[in-house]
């Protein structure tokens, strides 16, 4: 080609060489094989595009944190309210005439089945022990029931009894923080239910969780009874 004096040939060869260079730019050899060069097919990412997403992530994170804080605050407030209601229920006496009115404000703890009819204790030489109120049995008998409920497996303890008496899980967790949860459960149940808090109802709940030993303690006749 160097000895060819024809400029047209030289120019033609130069154009062909330029076309070959363009073809080689579109194909890149990798390990002996040719692969298309796609680096120039997509425009480069504009600078600062990734930095625009950071405020969005920060806003989402702040929303999640505020939601968690609000949830924790609500749980603490609800637990504190339940503790206050439980403390008020302890002070309710059996003969308080306003007990039934306050019972409507404390339904958060116990949900009594509507089918249960109030059992009125019969008077006479042979009263029906099943209709006797729990708070009317002797103090020593109550303490023995509470002691037995604190012993044994949790599935047959006071927690399971609370579920059969209509208490929700949150109320059971609140009572678990007390030093004597079995005492708190039975006293609160007796105060909330009033004339429905009979030995028959309690014995049925105890039998449902397999605590016949506690049922025997309640069924055993006492030498003397006293109103607590």
From Swiss-Prot:
> What Gene3D superfamilies does this protein map onto?
6.10.250.1780, Death Domain, Fas (1.10.533.10)
Q: Which residue ranges are assigned to the Cytoplasmic compartment in the record's topology? A: 74-228
Question: Which ranges form a coiled coil?
Answer: none
Q: Which regions face the Extracellular side of the membrane? A: 1-52
CDD domains named in the record: Death_p75NR
- Domain (Death): give its ranges: 143-222
Gene Ontology cellular component? Answer: lamellipodium; membrane; nuclear envelope lumen; nucleus; plasma membrane
Record field: compositional bias (Basic and acidic residues): 90-105
Membrane topology summary = Single-pass type III membrane protein
Recite the UniProt keywords alphabetically: Apoptosis, Cell membrane, Glycoprotein, Membrane, Nucleus, Transmembrane, Transmembrane helix
From the Swiss-Prot or TrEMBL record, state where the protein is found: Cell membrane; Nucleus
- InterPro entries in UniProt: DEATH-like_dom_sf, Death_dom, Neurotrophin_rcpt-DD, TNFR16_TM
The record's section on PROSITE patterns has:
DEATH_DOMAIN
**Residues annotated as region Disordered?**
87-122
Q: Which domain of life is it from?
A: Eukaryota
Instruction: Give the residue spans that cross the bilayer.
Output: 53-73
- So which tissues is this one expressed in? Detected in lung and testis.
Q: Which GO terms describe its biological process?
A: apoptotic process; signal transduction
Q: Which positions does UniProt annotate with glycan attachment?
A: 4, 37
Q: What does this protein do?
A: Modulates NTRK1 signaling. Can activate several intracellular signaling pathways, leading to activation of JUN. Promotes apoptosis. Promotes translocation of SORT1 to the cell membrane, and thereby hinders lysosomal degradation of SOTR1 and promotes its interaction with NGFR.
- Subunit structure, interactors included: Interacts with NGFR. Interacts with NTRK1. Interacts with SORT1.
Tell me the protein's name: Death domain-containing membrane protein NRADD
According to its UniProt entry, this protein's organism is Mus musculus
């Amino acid at each position: 080609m160097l000895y060819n004096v024809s400029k047209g040939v030289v120019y033609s060869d130069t154009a062909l060489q330029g076309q070959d260079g363009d073809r080689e730019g579109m194909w890149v050899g990798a390990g002996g094989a040719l692969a298309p060069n796609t680096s120039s097919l997509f425009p480069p990412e504009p600078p600062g595009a990734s930095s625009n997403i950071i405020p969005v992530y920060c806003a989402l994170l702040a929303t999640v944190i505020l939601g968690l804080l609000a949830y924790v605050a609500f749980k603490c407030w609800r637990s504190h309210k339940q503790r206050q209601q439980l403390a008020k229920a302890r002070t309710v006496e059996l003969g308080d005439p306003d007990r039934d009115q306050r019972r409507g404000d404390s339904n958060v703890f116990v949900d009594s089945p509507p089918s249960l009819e109030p059992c009125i204790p019969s008077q006479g030489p042979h009263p029906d022990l099943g209709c006797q109120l729990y708070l009317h049995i002797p103090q020593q008998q109550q303490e023995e029931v509470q002691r037995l409920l604190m012993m044994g497996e949790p599935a047959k303890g006071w927690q399971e009894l609370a579920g059969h008496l209509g208490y929700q899980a949150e109320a059971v967790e609140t009572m678990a923080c007390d030093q004597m949860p079995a005492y708190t459960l039975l006293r609160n149940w007796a105060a909330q239910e009033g004339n429905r808090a009979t030995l028959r109802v309690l014995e049925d709940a105890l039998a449902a969780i397999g605590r016949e030993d506690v049922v025997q303690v309640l069924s055993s006749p006492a030498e003397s009874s006293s109103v607590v």
